[in-house]
Amino acid sequence: MNAAEIMRSYIIDIETYSIAEQAGMFCESLKENQDGSLFKDTKFCYYEDEPYEVSFIWDRDELRIQLTFKGDPDDSTWLIINGKRRFRGQIKDIEKSCRTFLDTLKEMTVS
């Protein structure tokens, strides 16, 4: 199962509309743009504290990939940690945010 399919399986059960909408749009963008190898061999974890936030988390060794969607869309973020390197971005313009997220993930997993 790829990252977008995993997200989709959880989004269906999110009750807070604004969170489900954000996560759903990001999931669609991820589905269109992702390289499946970026999430290869990761362990998935889902966290929810509705109606405030939900997080999708993937871990592999020192790599942590996290998407957090909050009730207030201005507070939603993506986070990538690899060892001592840490990058975080806001999820505003879904398409642009997703591309930036994936580009950063590629850069951090290659180097």
Describe each region flagged by the PLM.
Residues 88-91, 100, 109-111:
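Membrane-insertive, pore-forming/entry segments and their flanking low-complexity regions
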Residues 5-8, 62-96:
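Intrinsically disordered, low-complexity regulatory segments enriched in Ser/Thr/Pro
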Residues 22, 97-100:
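Exposed alpha-helical structural elements
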Residues 36-38, 61-63, 75-78, 97, ...:
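Charged interaction scaffolds used for protein-protein
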Residues 1-54, 88-92:
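Negatively charged, low-complexity tracts enriched in Asp/Glu with abundant Ser/Thr
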Residues 56-60:
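Active-site beta-strand termini and strand-to-loop segments that position acidic
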